[in-house]
């Protein structure tokens, strides 16, 4: 059995401890500490949770699937191991019509984002080359593998 990775945390006033709903979940749910109304414009939500992520790892903030079902867009964010401030969630709820009732309120204690802790390769060098090794894909972009 491997030793679990320890990530230290600090809660600011009103912050809610990130939790995994199930032991094998990849991400820790991040909770909104106060009611927030999401609009067309991105809203910055302070979770009031600070982390000390070990060197060689980073945190990725991303949407929970339930947020996507509700039409909420959560921008992906990277938390570097040397950052000690509070985690923020950048979210918006694009409206379909001009009815202000279509905006979504996220209530205190609800979770629309999750935090995934991942390792990364620290010793990386970029090497400028005149040409890159050919592949069967080459420069095929969006939908090049079939897509929808």
Please describe what each predicted stretch is:
Residues 1-148:
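Non-catalytic terminal segments and appended small domains
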């Amino acid at each position: 059995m491997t030793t679990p990775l320890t990530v230290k945390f600090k809660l600011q006033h009103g912050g809610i401890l990130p939790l995994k709903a199930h032991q094998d979940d990849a991400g820790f749910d991040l909770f909104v500490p106060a009611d927030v109304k999401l609009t067309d414009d991105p809203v910055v939500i302070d979770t009031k949770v600070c982390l000390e992520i070990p060197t060689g790892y980073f945190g990725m903030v991303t949407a929970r699937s339930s947020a996507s079902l509700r039409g909420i867009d959560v921008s992906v964010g990277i938390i570097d191991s040397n950052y000690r401030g509070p985690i923020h969630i950048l979210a918006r709820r694009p409206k379909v019509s001009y009815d202000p009732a279509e905006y979504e309120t996220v209530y205190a204690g609800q979770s629309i984002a999750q935090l995934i802790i991942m390792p990364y390769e620290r010793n990386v060098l970029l090497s400028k080359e005149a040409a890159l090794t050919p592949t069967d894909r080459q420069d095929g972009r969006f939908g090049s593998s079939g897509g929808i």
